[in-house]
């Protein structure tokens, strides 16, 4: 008799996705981040659920309810800090996952890649709205500044901003709707992640060499289940180290001051994982231009597959492209640093140069270097 895991309508879906899935035999630890993102999402939904049981989305009580969670709820402090730092771990995994896709040419799976970009936008929106909920100074002013960017849209901008606010400023209506969206979006992310996986399993995974691996596949379980468990252990170790030893390391001290519309903090800045985009936004002295650059800094990923001019899929055997890739990584780290600095000399010019370099590398240098490498292959 055939095993139930291969015949049962529900179990066979799990079997074909996580047990008997034919997987390339040579995928490295860089392929762990997909499963780690799944773990992050589950952790965030669970901790978020328990936080939502005690949180109140009202301007008068939101800040106090978060303090109440940390002080009075059993293990509320660890749930709150796991949720806050879990977001940071989520973005670390996201950036490494996207970086892996760029390096090894995984973007050639168009559907998987494009759904991944939609996922990235959705996670960023969710994280932004979550940051508003504690209703500290940085929550309030961050929400004010970022939602105000929509006013740069010609003709409908101002109406759009007031529609999102639910009034003439960030207030009770804004907080309530942000809480509602912050609660529902992770489930949309889970659905999108399932579709992401569905499209990936249509083609099978890429591998470091970028060469089709149909002739050399191994079952996902036990080889990669054990590898993923090891990755998960590292993830949880890092998360717990962060949440238990330095929970406020990545946060902003201003957010321990209750929101005050009459007092603007000296430096308004988002969480660290948005700083690179924030630096690109600030580097353009025009409001609409800055907003467009901000959106394009992520949306540029959509055209990466169209700009793939190399004869090889992966960068594994392309040293010039590798140099360019690591220059891009250094550039993004520079942008992240600049995003957290005040708007003054020399940070302004560094930010502008780093922003230009970011787009030049992705849109001009990468395709050009790939063509040069193709010609070098003929020698």
From Swiss-Prot:
Entry-linked SUPFAM superfamilies: a domain/subunit of cytochrome bc1 complex (Ubiquinol-cytochrome c reductase), Transmembrane di-heme cytochromes
Transmembrane segments: 33-53, 77-98, 113-133, 178-198, 226-246, 288-308, 320-340, 347-367
InterPro entries: Cyt_b/b6_C, Cyt_b/b6_C_sf, Cyt_b/b6_N, Cytb/b6-like_sf, Cytochrome_b, Cytochrome_b_C_euk/bac, Cytochrome_b_N_euk/bac, Di-haem_cyt_TM
Keyword vocabulary terms for this entry: Electron transport, Heme, Iron, Membrane, Metal-binding, Mitochondrion, Mitochondrion inner membrane, Respiratory chain, Transmembrane, Transmembrane helix, Transport, Ubiquinone
Gene Ontology biological-process annotations: mitochondrial electron transport, ubiquinol to cytochrome c
PROSITE patterns in UniProt: CYTB_CTER, CYTB_NTER
Residues involved in a ubiquinone binding: 201
Electron transport listed as a keyword: yes
GO molecular function terms noted in the UniProt entry: metal ion binding; ubiquinol-cytochrome-c reductase activity
Cofactor field: heme b
Residues bound to heme b b562: 83, 182
Binding sites annotated in the UniProt record for heme b b566: 97, 196
The UniProt record lists the keyword Transport: yes
CDD domains assigned: cytochrome_b_C, Cytochrome_b_N
One CC-aspect GO term: respiratory chain complex III
Cofactor: binding comment: Binds 2 heme b groups non-covalently.
Mode of membrane association: Multi-pass membrane protein
Location within or outside the cell: Mitochondrion inner membrane
Quaternary organization: The cytochrome bc1 complex contains 11 subunits: 3 respiratory subunits (MT-CYB, CYC1 and UQCRFS1), 2 core proteins (UQCRC1 and UQCRC2) and 6 low-molecular weight proteins (UQCRH/QCR6, UQCRB/QCR7, UQCRQ/QCR8, UQCR10/QCR9, UQCR11/QCR10 and a cleavage product of UQCRFS1). This cytochrome bc1 complex then forms a dimer.
Family: Belongs to the cytochrome b family.
Note: Heme 1 (or BL or b562) is low-potential and absorbs at about 562 nm, and heme 2 (or BH or b566) is high-potential and absorbs at about 566 nm.
Job of this protein: Component of the ubiquinol-cytochrome c reductase complex (complex III or cytochrome b-c1 complex) that is part of the mitochondrial respiratory chain. The b-c1 complex mediates electron transfer from ubiquinol to cytochrome c. Contributes to the generation of a proton gradient across the mitochondrial membrane that is then used for ATP synthesis.
Entry protein name: Cytochrome b
Organism of origin: Pteronura brasiliensis
Gene that encodes the chain: MT-CYB
């Amino acid at each position: 008799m055939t095993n139930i895991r291969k015949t049962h309508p529900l179990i066979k879906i799990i079997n074909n996705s996580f047990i008997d899935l034919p997987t390339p035999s040579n995928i490295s630890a860089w392929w762990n981040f997909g499963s780690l993102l799944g773990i992050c999402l589950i952790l965030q939904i669970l901790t978020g659920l328990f936080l939502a049981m005690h949180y109140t989305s009202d301007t008068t009580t939101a800040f106090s309810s978060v303090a109440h969670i940390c002080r009075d709820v059993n293990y509320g402090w660890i749930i709150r800090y796991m949720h806050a730092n879990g977001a940071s771990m989520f973005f670390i995994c996201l950036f490494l996952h996207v970086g892996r896709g760029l390096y090894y040419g995984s973007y050639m799976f168009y559907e998987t890649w494009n759904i991944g970009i939609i996922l990235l936008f959705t996670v960023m929106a969710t994280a932004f709205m979550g940051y508003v909920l504690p209703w500290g100074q940085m929550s309030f002013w961050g929400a004010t500044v970022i939602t105000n960017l929509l006013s740069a849209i010609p003709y409908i901008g101002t109406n759009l901003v007031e529609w999102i606010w639910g009034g003439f400023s960030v207030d009770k209506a804004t907080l309530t709707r942000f809480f509602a969206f912050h609660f529902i979006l992770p489930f949309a992310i889970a659905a999108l992640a399932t579709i992401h996986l569905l499209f990936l399993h249509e083609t099978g995974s890429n591998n470091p060499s970028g060469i089709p691996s149909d002739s050399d596949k191994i079952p996902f379980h036990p080889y990669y289940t054990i590898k993923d468990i090891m990755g998960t252990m590292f993830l949880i170790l890092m998360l717990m180290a962060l949440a238990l030893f330095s929970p406020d390391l990545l946060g902003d001290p201003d957010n321990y001051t209750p929101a005050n519309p009459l007092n603007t903090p000296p430096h308004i800045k988002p969480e660290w994982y948005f700083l690179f985009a924030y630096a690109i936004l600030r580097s353009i002295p025009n409001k609409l231009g800055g907003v467009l650059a901000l959106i394009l800094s992520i949306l540029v990923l959509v055209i990466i597959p169209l700009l793939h001019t190399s004869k090889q899929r992966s960068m594994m055997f392309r040293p010039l492209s590798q140099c360019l890739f690591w220059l891009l990584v250094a550039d993004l780290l520079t942008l992240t640093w600049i995003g957290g600095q005040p708007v003054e000399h020399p940070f302004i010019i560094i930010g502008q140069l780093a922003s230009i370099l970011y787009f030049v590398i992705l849109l001009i240098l990468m395709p050009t270097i790939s063509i040069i490498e193709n010609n070098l292959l003929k020698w």
